[in-house]
């Protein structure tokens, strides 16, 4: 749908890569690059190995998720709970950076529970910055670890993109990508006036046809001539490819 937009995988827990079906977890349709592998974990050595596997699989970026608030993720000591341990995050990212040549980035929130002051997220970014990370994807909401479901955590905590913009001002040598609540390419254009990039989450799967307009609207490329019928044909081919690699029934069997 877009040749320019960077696609991020769903978060893959590092233990799943170490002990699971690595070929399936790291498999993707070639030709859709740039693609980023998003990892979840808190073991520096394990994450470094997973980052290396990701680079070998052809990923253009390795991202560490420090934004997911789900209880299951919390219990595994990764996701947004890691924002409460910034030095641990810095150690993980440093180990990942030392193992690969592609960029290593971090995705995080602007706060956790009652830790919502600018100083909290500034100190988190500062600690990670000192370890060498220079690309920050900021979901401009705090996460509430108790009382809200992951879905509610994407809506109920208020957006504060101004706080994210202050991070950009305070760390001018770094790249900041804003995420959260952006639904139109017009909003993307507005936010690109103060951020280096914009990440679409739910809108990308609620309204995927929007992606056909990205290259023209944001990069000045010629308008897409892709039709919906062509997209459906490509999707059918992809399903056939996945089925050849591993029968879909094997993934859904209980």
Locations of the language-model features?
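Short secondary-structure transition/capping segments
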Residues: 19-22, 74-77, 117-118, 148-151, ...
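Conserved beta-strand positions in the central sheet of alpha/beta enzyme cores
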Residues: 7-8, 36-38, 63-65, 105, ...
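Active-site beta-loop-alpha junctions enriched in small/polar residues
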Residues: 12-14, 40-42, 67-69, 109-113, ...
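Short, hinge-like loop/turn segments at secondary-structure boundaries
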Residues: 24-28, 80-82, 122-123, 154-155, ...
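Glycine-rich, positively charged N-terminal anion/phosphate-binding segment
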Residues: 1-60
């Amino acid at each position: 749908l877009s040749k320019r937009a960077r696609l991020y995988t769903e978060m893959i827990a590092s233990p799943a890569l170490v002990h699971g079906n690595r070929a399936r977890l790291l498999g993707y349709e070639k030709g859709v690059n740039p693609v980023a592998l998003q990892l979840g974990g808190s073991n520096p050595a394990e994450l470094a190995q997973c980052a290396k596997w990701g680079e070998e699989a052809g990923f253009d970026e390795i991202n560490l998720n420090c934004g997911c608030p789900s209880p299951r993720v919390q219990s595994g000591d990764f996701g947004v709970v890691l924002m409460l341990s910034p030095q641990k995050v810095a150690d993980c990212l440093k180990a990942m950076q030392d193992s690969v040549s592609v960029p290593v980035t971090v995705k995080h929130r602007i706060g956790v529970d009652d830790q919502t002051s600018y100083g909290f997220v500034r100190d988190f970014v500062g600690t990670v910055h000192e370890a060498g990370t220079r690309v920050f994807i900021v979901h401009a909401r705090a996460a509430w670890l108790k009382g809200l479901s992951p879905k509610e955590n994407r809506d109920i905590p208020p957006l504060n993109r101004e706080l994210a913009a202050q991070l950009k001002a305070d760390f001018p040598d770094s790249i900041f990508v804003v995420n959260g609540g952006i639904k139109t390419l017009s909003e993307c254009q507005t936010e690109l006036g103060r951020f280096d990039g914009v990440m679409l989450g739910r809108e990308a799967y609620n309204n995927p046809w929007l992606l056909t307009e990205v290259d023209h609207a944001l990069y000045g490329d010629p308008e897409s001539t892709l039709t919906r019928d062509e997209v459906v044909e490509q999707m059918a081919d992809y399903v056939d490819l996945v089925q050849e690699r591993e029968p879909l029934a094997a993934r859904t069997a209980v």
